[in-house]
Amino acid sequence: MKYAGMPFGMWVLFAGSFQKQLTAVLGYDADTARAITKKAKPQYRQIIRRLPEFEKADRFKMNLVNSAMIGAFILSMPQRPEVDRLTDYYARSMMTAPMQWFCRKSGKSKFTAKDITAMKATAALKAADRNPYSWNMDFYEYTDGSGYEGRFTKCGICVLMKELGLYDLTPALCHLDYTMSEAGGVTDFVRQYTLASGGPYCDCGYKKKG
């Protein structure tokens, strides 16, 4: 994967927040936070370079790029964080003001015909059959009309985190689904299993609020 484009853009958008939250959540002093960030950047670029390019129709490239960034930061920390603290750190790092705006904007189109069509197309794509760093998903609309579920049987984040030796920390990344759903303001996120915790699949259920 080329660093120019989305990977570069994501670093520009989020690196400052990742650095700030090293102090706010994980308790590193400002100098250490700067040093971690400085070390993480080449690590991030190296991870990105090892990844294949995603197909044009694959909507999950950003998910993998984000996980490459958090992976690079973890590998650059002097001490490996616990899952619960990493969960808080990752959520706060990702939920910048522009990201919250993006979630609200996405929320406005949730459950529209266009959204449903896009979800069905993603399920049909089965991108992980050709790219192990992508996702395979089945799509289910709830029979009572209350929303829908994406059920993932292959997960690019799981593959990457295993390669980085960070698989036990993957649940911290999974939890961002709840945070983003809440920020969108129109759905209640429901989940029974995750692949990262040994489940048969990872279910992402979106129920209409109210």
Model-identified regions with their sequence ranges:
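N-terminal, charged low-complexity regulatory/assembly segments
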Residues: 1-77
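Charged/polar, low-hydrophobicity segments characteristic of intrinsically disordered regions
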Residues: 25-31, 54-57, 99-113, 190
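Short, well-structured alpha-helical interface segments that form or flank functional binding sites
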Residues: 68, 176, 199
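A short catalytic or substrate-binding loop motif that flags glycine-/basic-rich loops and adjacent residues
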Residues: 131, 197-198
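Short, hydrophobic/π-rich interface segment
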Residues: 138-196
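Short acidic-glycine loop/turn motifs at beta-strand connectors
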Residues: 143-144, 208-210
